[in-house]
């Protein structure tokens, strides 16, 4: 979404009591770093070992799961003011499939398995759902944990208006 939009989004989410880093300063000119950038208040926590931390017992894991689920549910229910909607591109299943077909057509060779998968996706498209704000990369590596609790959700550069099942899918992917 670009750093300016990400900065504005973090300000908005912080005002709604989301567990995100507090944005402090936007340097559009790149005076401080040589490139446009923004600064945030440090959020205590680490994303390492969320799934494998031996210090987390079953009750800790249940509470952490509740914390994460609460934040994600709150995000997907959030009403975005019209002046904030301009920050986001709308995405949907069809636009993703179209983009994949376009990329596939640019290749100098064919990939029949990918073509088959795209046809399957077209035929088995999920039921249309209401669109909501999505993180776009909701996974363990973007969740900060400290003292067995969720302290922050970071890396909002892929945020968009889309199907909330995208975030759930990212979170459930075994590769994280």
Which residues does each PLM region occupy?
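Short loop segments at secondary-structure junctions
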Residues: 43-44, 147-149, 176
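Active-site acidic catalytic loop and adjacent metal/ATP-binding pocket
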Residues: 23, 75, 119-166
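Glycine-rich, phosphate-binding/catalytic loops in enzymes
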Residues: 56-57, 152, 169-171
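Active-site micro-motifs of SAM-dependent methyltransferase domains
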Residues: 45, 82, 140, 145, ...
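Residues that line or immediately flank small-molecule/substrate-binding pockets and catalytic motifs
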Residues: 27, 157, 172
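Active-site activation/catalytic loop segments of kinase-like enzymes and analogous catalytic loops
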Residues: 166-176
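Short, function-defining helix-loop hinge/capping sites that tune catalysis or transport
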Residues: 14, 49, 143-145, 163, ...
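ATP-binding pocket architecture of kinase catalytic cores
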Residues: 1-95, 99-117, 124-130
């Amino acid at each position: 979404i670009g750093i300016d939009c990400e900065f504005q989004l973090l300000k908005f989410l912080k005002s709604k009591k989301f567990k995100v880093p507090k944005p402090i300063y936007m340097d559009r000119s790149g005076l401080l770093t040589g490139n446009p950038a923004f600064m945030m208040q440090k959020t205590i926590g680490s994303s390492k070992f969320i799934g494998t931390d031996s210090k987390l017992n079953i009750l800790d894991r249940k509470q952490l799961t509740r914390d994460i689920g609460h934040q994600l549910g709150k995000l997907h229910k959030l009403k975005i003011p019209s002046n904030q909607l301009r920050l986001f591109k709308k995405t949907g299943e069809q636009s993703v499939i179209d983009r994949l077909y376009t990329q596939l057509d640019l290749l100098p060779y064919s990939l029949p398995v990918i073509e088959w998968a795209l046809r399957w996706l077209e035929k088995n498209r999920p039921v249309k759902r209401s669109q909501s704000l999505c993180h776009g990369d909701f996974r363990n590596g973007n969740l900060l944990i400290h003292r067995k609790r969720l302290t922050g959700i970071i890396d909002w550069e892929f945020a968009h208006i889309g199907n909330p099942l995208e975030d759930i899918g990212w979170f459930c992917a075994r590769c994280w």
